[in-house]
């Protein structure tokens, strides 16, 4: 696109001419990321002061100039490609660690700070930042949030989404907002996680930091087949064992790593696991015996504990070097990023291997196995067009196989442009429509990283919607009727928190089934009207536990009321009826999902103002866990973003925001 000279003049005043570049070399350097996408921007701005972000966006908004936020550009999905031209906003120079507070457990950082920089600053203080993508030495913390990247420790500690406490954020029109986990209403930090720069620009982040465990023990375990190794992971999950890390790799990976990094991986096995435990010596000793027994049951060849810290670090250096090791073998590496329920790993592996063999593709297989996330690393030469087409086709088939196994097309690498089309494998039309509405609420002019994440012309390609249950169908009909006659209503369960005061209530009491307690994946799926008492009774009978209190109210109320914010991170899947009567579905039994906007976080704490949650899938545990602390219920005033999204979803105010109602 042609950028008006007046816009250049205004931008130059803000950032200085040395930071606004249009020369061919600069634009070529910023025309690509780690994907195959190559698109030349019209200009490049180096952002060296956080205070200029909002003024820059105001100018871009005034002149309707699209922009792409960019830091280290380590993503594999084309998220940094400037598809509509416009301006690349390089936040990498904003790389200061502003504050570290070990007493309260947080750090404030600028968006260009890398994970490695933060870890180096924390280590002498005896602290660490839990998310650990393999590229943490170079990838930025804002990029991690934008992609919801996770890494090896996700199984125990969760992904980036779970470790961001506050952010300063700039909307595409230049409006600055501050978001905190203490805010009432929907979890907007969670919604921004994984949004790939399509909703605005991250200015600063406050991240959670944790004390380094005093005792950590790492094991290298070898197997005669990759199937045996991933079955081990499924069995660990089924036993409720949660190691600090569980990484798997095949012999193609180990050979490449040994030639490059000399990590000490045995070459006489078809697969290996890196398992890591932390805790007290007694806890580690108990779990070590369980680990070894499960590994032996699955035909392990060697069970080797790291004897020194140097040996432990060497094992992890090899794992982090896997991508670079494969990149030495060919001009290009295409990295897949599917996630399936942990119990489905063996079946997914079988499907993936069949696809790669049928296409005669040479690839390594690498897994964040503890959370069902795997990365086929396919080597090829993009200058060979038939080869590139074949590889791209195979990877799409791999992602379809993930969806067929109840999984997602992205666990942590995002969607960008390269996986945009396959979103239709995973989501039906109403859910994709909701993604569009979320984008429009934040960015009505579609200037922020346009044409990413959401498929183009998806109406006929979207996944067919599964049938609605009888109770859900009845509620959908009631919603449509009330919309038709303009009869606003309040969504209620047991009326334990909200006094309806004679208002037209819409009850979830007919949604009262516990649909599945899955002790293989350690998840439960239940309808929103199930009472917490009945749920607690059923879990106790099944010998499993959740963080939900055994008190008044329903599952849907616990999730939507805002009284149990620590429960949000436990929720993996959701179904909800929107104010137009359509049903949206997101997630499932997945420990990771970076495909699309996080709808679980949109409805969390939304107090029934955006739609009626019909069912949830959430984590359970093999051992007792502390109950979530409960806050008093107060009807919240609508946050700027809350009001904007509500206007998109519910323009007729069918489910009103009523501030000031007290707990009952």
What residue ranges belong to the model's regions?
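FAD-binding subdomain of flavoenzyme oxidoreductases
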Residues: 96-100, 107-247, 448, 463-467, ...
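A charged N-terminal "starter" segment
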Residues: 1-19
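Glycine-rich N-terminal segment of FAD-binding domains in flavoprotein oxidoreductases
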Residues: 25, 32-94, 368-369, 469-517, ...
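Intrinsic disorder at enzyme termini
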Residues: 1-4, 427-482, 486, 638-664
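A glycine-rich phosphate-binding loop feature that marks nucleotide/adenosyl-phosphate handling sites
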Residues: 28, 76-78, 135-141, 247-259, ...
């Amino acid at each position: 696109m042609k950028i008006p000279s007046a816009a250049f003049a205004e931008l130059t005043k803000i950032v200085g001419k040395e930071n606004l570049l249009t020369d061919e070399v600069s634009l070529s350097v910023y025309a690509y990321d780690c994907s195959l996408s190559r698109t030349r921007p019209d200009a490049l701005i180096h952002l060296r002061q956080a205070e200029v972000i909002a003024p820059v966006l105001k100018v871009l908004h005034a002149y309707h100039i699209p922009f792409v936020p960019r830091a280290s550009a380590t993503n594999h999905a084309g998220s940094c490609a400037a598809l509509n031209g416009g301006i690349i906003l390089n936040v990498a120079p904003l790389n200061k660690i502003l504050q570290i507070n070990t007493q309260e457990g947080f750090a404030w950082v600028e968006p260009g700070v890398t994970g490695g920089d933060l870890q180096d600053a924390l280590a002498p203080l005896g602290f660490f930042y839990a998310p650990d993508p393999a590229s943490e030495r170079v990838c930025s913390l804002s990029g991690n949030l934008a992609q919801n990247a996770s890494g090896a420790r996700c199984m125990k500690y969760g992904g980036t989404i779970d470790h961001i406490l506050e952010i300063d954020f700039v909307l595409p029109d230049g409006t600055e907002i501050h978001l905190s986990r203490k805010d009432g209403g929907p979890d907007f930090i969670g919604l921004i996680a994984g949004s790939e720069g399509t909703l605005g620009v991250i200015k600063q982040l406050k991240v959670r930091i944790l004390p380094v465990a005093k005792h950590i023990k790492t094991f290298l375990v070898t197997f005669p087949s990759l199937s045996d190794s991933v079955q081990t992971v499924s069995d660990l999950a089924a036993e409720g064992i949660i190691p600090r890390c569980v990484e798997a790799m095949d012999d193609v990976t180990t050979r490449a790593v040994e030639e490059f990094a000399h990590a000490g991986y045995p070459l006489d096995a078809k697969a290996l696991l890196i398992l890591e435990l932390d805790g007290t010596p007694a806890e580690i000793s108990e779990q070590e015996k369980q680990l070894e027994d499960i590994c032996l049951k699955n035909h392990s060849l060697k069970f080797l504990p790291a004897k020194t810290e140097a040996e432990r670090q060497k094992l992890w250096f090899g794992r982090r070097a896997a991508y670079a090791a494969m990149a030495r073998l060919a001009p290009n590496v295409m990295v897949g990023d599917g996630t399936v329920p942990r119990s489905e790993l063996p079946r997914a592996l079988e499907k993936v291997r069949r696809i790669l063999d049928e296409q005669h593709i040479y690839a390594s297989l690498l897994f964040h196995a503890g959370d069902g996330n795997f990365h086929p690393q396919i080597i090829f030469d993009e200058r060979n067009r038939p080869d590139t087409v074949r590889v791209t086709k195979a990877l799409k088939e791999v992602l379809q196989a993930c969806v067929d196994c109840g999984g997602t097309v992205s666990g942590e690498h995002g969607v960008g442009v390269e996986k945009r089309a396959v979103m239709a494998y995973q989501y039906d039309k109403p859910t994709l429509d909701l993604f569009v509405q979320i984008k429009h609420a934040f960015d009505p002019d579609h200037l922020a990283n346009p044409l990413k994440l959401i498929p183009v012309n998806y109406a006929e390609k979207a996944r067919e919607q599964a049938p609605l249950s009888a109770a859900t169908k009845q509620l959908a009909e009631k919603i449509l009727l009330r919309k038709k006659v303009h009869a606003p209503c309040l969504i209620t369960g047991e009326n334990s928190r909200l006094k309806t005061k004679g208002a037209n209530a819409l009850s979830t009491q007919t949604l009262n089934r516990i649909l599945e307690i899955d002790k293989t994946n350690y998840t439960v799926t239940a309808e929103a009207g199930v009472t917490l008492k009945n749920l607690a009774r059923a879990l106790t009978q099944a010998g499993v536990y959740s963080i939900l209190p055994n008190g008044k109210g329903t599952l849907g109320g616990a999730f939507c009321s805002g009284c149990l914010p620590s429960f949000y991170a436990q929720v993996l899947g959701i179904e909800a009826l929107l104010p137009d009567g359509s049903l949206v579905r997101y997630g499932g039994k997945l420990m990771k999902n970076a495909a699309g906007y996080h709808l679980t976080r949109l409805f969390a704490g939304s107090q029934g103002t955006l739609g009626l949650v019909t069912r949830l899938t959430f984590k359970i545990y093999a051992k007792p866990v502390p109950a979530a602390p409960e806050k008093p219920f107060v009807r919240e005033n609508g946050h700027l973003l809350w009001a904007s999204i509500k206007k998109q979803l519910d323009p007729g105010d069918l489910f009103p925001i009523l501030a000031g109602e007290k707990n009952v």
